[in-house]
Amino acid sequence: MTRSLKKNPFVANHLLGKIEKLNMRAEKEIIVTWSRASTIIPIMIGHTIAIHNGKEHLPIYITESMVGHKLGEFAPTLTFRGHARNDKKSRR
């Protein structure tokens, strides 16, 4: 289910505060966050946000087409290493 339109999009308060400070000073710097559930809103466009993927922070540049998506969608947490092999060499 999608979020109700009566509610505002979720954005972590600490993340919103950091972005508003940078916008007021007209500065661009990397913002580090663990908040993967935060929704990207229009005031974030043009900033670089380092999103935690469980191991490290991946820097993501926010563009206009990302608005409305969650931050966690752009920092994959799993790496697929391939299916198990069936030959006899891999069993040894």
Swiss-Prot record:
Principal location: plastid
Pfam families from the UniProt entry: Ribosomal_S19 (PF00203)
UniProt keyword list: Chloroplast, Plastid, Ribonucleoprotein, Ribosomal protein, RNA-binding, rRNA-binding
Subcellular location: Plastid, Chloroplast
Keyword Transit peptide attributed: no
GO cellular component, one term: chloroplast
Gene3D superfamilies from the UniProt entry: 30s Ribosomal Protein S19, Chain A
Source domain of life: Eukaryota
One of the GO biological process terms: ribosomal small subunit assembly
One function term, GO molecular function aspect: structural constituent of ribosome
Family named by the database record: Belongs to the universal ribosomal protein uS19 family.
Described function: Protein S19 forms a complex with S13 that binds strongly to the 16S ribosomal RNA.
Entry protein name: Small ribosomal subunit protein uS19c
UniProt lineage: Eukaryota, Viridiplantae, Streptophyta, Embryophyta, Tracheophyta
